[in-house]
């Protein structure tokens, strides 16, 4: 894996982007490698969760993004295991320094009763498309945001995250 995330031999000639960065960001999310994820983030991210019942941030700081995704109410929950698989993808070149990746995703989630990960409490999987935004900063491609759109969910996806919008609605 090209750790610097610069375009490599696998670079798409039309976009100038590297498929390595999209693989890297999903690997980091699936393994919960927060340091590696932080290393590929742009200083500010466009985060649009409106299609999944949450908010939109036009310029969320990388630190705030990390705090959100690594929080115990989200992917930082030690009882949640996840794997994000990328399906069909196409790249849209916006400029020499901005690319949008359009990705088909399946995100599998399993919640355990305790951090020892021995007993499964529930499963929840999501099938979605996702726009990922990438910017080139100092010659290096960085992950600059996302905009998911869920097509459909399996099992009890709405119960996977303690901080999920459905959990919040149950308490209001």
Curated annotation (Swiss-Prot):
GO biological processes: melanin metabolic process
Pfam families per the UniProt record, alphabetical: Scytalone_dh
InterPro entries cross-referenced by the UniProt entry: NTF2-like_dom_sf (IPR032710), Scytalone_dehydratase (IPR004235), Scytalone_dh (IPR049884)
EC numbers: 4.2.1.-
Recorded superkingdom: Eukaryota
Active site (record annotation): 84, 109
Keywords: Lyase
GO terms of molecular function: scytalone dehydratase activity
Family recorded in the similarity comment: Belongs to the scytalone dehydratase family.
Subunit structure: Homotrimer. Each subunit contains an active site, located in the central part of the hydrophobic core of the monomer, which functions independently.
Job description of the protein: Scytalone dehydratase-like protein; part of the Pks2 gene cluster that mediates the formation of infectious structures (appressoria), enabling these fungi to kill insects faster. The product of the Pks2 gene cluster is different from the one of Pks1 and has still not been identified.
UniProt-recorded name of the protein: Scytalone dehydratase-like protein Arp1
Originating organism: Metarhizium robertsii (strain ARSEF 23 / ATCC MYA-3075) (Metarhizium anisopliae (strain ARSEF 23))
């Amino acid at each position: 894996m090209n750790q610097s995330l610069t375009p490599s031999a696998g670079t798409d000639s039309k976009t100038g982007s590297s498929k390595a960065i999209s693989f890297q960001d999903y690997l980091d999310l699936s393994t919960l490698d927060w340091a590696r994820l932080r290393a590929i983030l742009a200083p500010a991210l466009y985060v649009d969760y409106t299609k999944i019942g949450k908010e939109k941030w036009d310029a969320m700081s990388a630190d705030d993004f990390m705090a959100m995704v690594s929080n115990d109410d989200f992917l930082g929950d030690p009882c949640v295991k996840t794997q994000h698989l990328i399906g069909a993808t196409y790249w849209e070149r916006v400029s020499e320094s901005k690319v949008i990746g359009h990705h088909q995703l399946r995100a599998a989630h399993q919640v355990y009763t305790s951090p020892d990960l021995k007993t499964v409490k529930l499963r929840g999987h999501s099938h979605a498309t996702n726009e990922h935004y990438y910017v080139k900063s100092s010659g290096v491609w960085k992950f600059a945001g996302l905009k998911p759109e869920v097509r459909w969910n399996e099992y009890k996806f709405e119960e996977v995250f303690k901080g999920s919008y459905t959990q919040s609605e149950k308490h209001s």
